[in-house]
């Protein structure tokens, strides 16, 4: 994939598998139901992949409730219910981080992470209260749905070309290759991006010859809305969907791209993917790549690919708070090196724009002191900006937040921490050490002890906040990994799945609760590949490690990864 991504397209044959083998599943796919005492309110459940599952209440609001209630035939929604108010469901948490406009016909048409991609438990199952009224799903009516057969019939219509009245020519000018297809104009009229007029009888599509073998399957999708997508066919299908303006297929194929993201440790594939996402306007693909590169920024900035990153990509990266680096000073040094490598390609205005994304307030105070005497070309050409950043950084470190609150808030997100993994603010746990009898529990300089079997514990002391005001005020943190249900029980914890991790302060955290909050993070990294593939927050000091199928990115090292616990203090 590394070499072929810049070429954009692959000549492959995809595995064909008909979804009609499971008619019962397809007939119910995406349906919702309410589980409660009365028909108009209850826990929301959605049907997918042959089973009912729940919806997480993260992002759950009235717009999402309106879609559910209308899908069930009620006039609208009265209110939402969160926190498992209607009891805890069972099975998978199918949907998380829902984002509906409120006008969708089906809940599954809204934006969400992906089927089964969630870090929620059933304690966060969402519910709704619908307005009572006419319910079109009442037993007084009978719904007849033969849409499954319609899709099959339309597929046969495409195959036969009976009555076709529209010609699509597919060509590659560089190879002088061309294919011709006869289709039905009425089908193409469904896709307004083609801008067909009443007199249009043919169109020509220019695309690489390596994609020509996928064109028939794509055109058949326009009839049936069904297609099998593999990692090797995804690029061509995505490009065709972009040309024809089939946004839904672009988003679905983008999820296949997500599976490719962790496969290249050189980052060349990811950078090419992002630029492709920009060209095709695929915001989902852009976000997935940026998230992965943010998580792996520590490795990215030390790779040869760093100097090839575009200005737009750099600008997008530097604005993110999920960016993982040792500290903010390391990021500034990497930016200075990138600008130096780019030379005259980066104008002075662009330099200023990028430097404004550096969070000088969060640079460790000892490194702020060193930056004063830096002789870098970027520093010399942007002296005023550096001095302003240094002044604000020293003020942030020397003064109580109550004194500088109004000024700091004006700086937007510049006082919000990224994920800083320096030794002062994070600790690592290697899961393989649990079963290693030769492991020295003091090798990192922390007190560590083992539970009866698979539990491992480790301690970290940090200042209450990075500001110099709090340097002498320490908080001790305890990190625990429970690898069996029995270990959870031994510690008085209920866990439905393992591994389960806990990260909590054992002293004095709450004395700062009116000034500081802790948005701590758990980072999972492949030990041998230097590959961060999952980041999540803690809920009530706990984090359930999701299965591979429910992660936003696939786990490339399911049996060989390490945990890193990161403390992230932030002024309130």
Curated annotation (Swiss-Prot):
Intracellular or extracellular location(s): Secreted; Secreted, Extracellular space, Extracellular matrix
GO CC annotations on file: extracellular region; membrane
Descriptive protein name: Galectin-3-binding protein B
PANTHER family for the chain: GALECTIN-3-BINDING PROTEIN, HL07962P-RELATED
SMART domains: BACK, SR
Disulfide bonds: 56-120, 69-130, 100-110
Organism field: Danio rerio
Glycan attachment positions: 135, 195, 202, 430, 548
Keyword Disulfide bond: yes
Domain BTB stretches: 164-231
Main function: Promotes integrin-mediated cell adhesion.
Gene for this chain: lgals3bpb
Keywords: Cell adhesion, Disulfide bond, Extracellular matrix, Glycoprotein, Secreted, Signal
